[in-house]
């Protein structure tokens, strides 16, 4: 079972990255920068030397926003449309070739994407790109964190988002969803719905995403501890757990250190 924290990449918070890299509780990281950037290359090298793992974000390798409006998490309707970039296959091939040539390919656990359906990616385009990644890198994992709309629209949805299907999610190996409200019975239900909509595949690794931030400005230490412990207890019930990937979007590093 892995443990990681979003938004702790070298190019975002170098001090926090090295603290976690040199510690003994974080063993997986997420890189959202360009793989060719110096910071991203240094991050991959350092992770490899420590024997830890990295997921690399692939959203902008293949997709681009046509329009993007208000964010849901500040209380307004989210509206987006995303299309495939021209020449996206060549871009994906170039990124993979760079990572392979780095000498640190072994440290790349796989590829990551965040809330693709809420962001406006169609089910067809999602399947197309993940299938291409699987074809090019059959030994690597493909990890997706869905919005609630993408897996349990009866709990929450927006902008006519079409939830995931077994066909569209066929090439995924690791999945999660993110919700940062008080931990309660809905989390088990949403997890069950996510698995059901993906065909109840036994090979899928299931992750949980604990809230370790002052989400919407009204979360405190107790909220975060309850959320973390709840996610962990839920994850321990899984036959094929992936791990915990804590989210720190608003508060890393100062308030996270305080927590």
Where are these predicted regions, by residue range?
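Glycan-processing catalytic domains of CAZymes
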Residues: 1-259
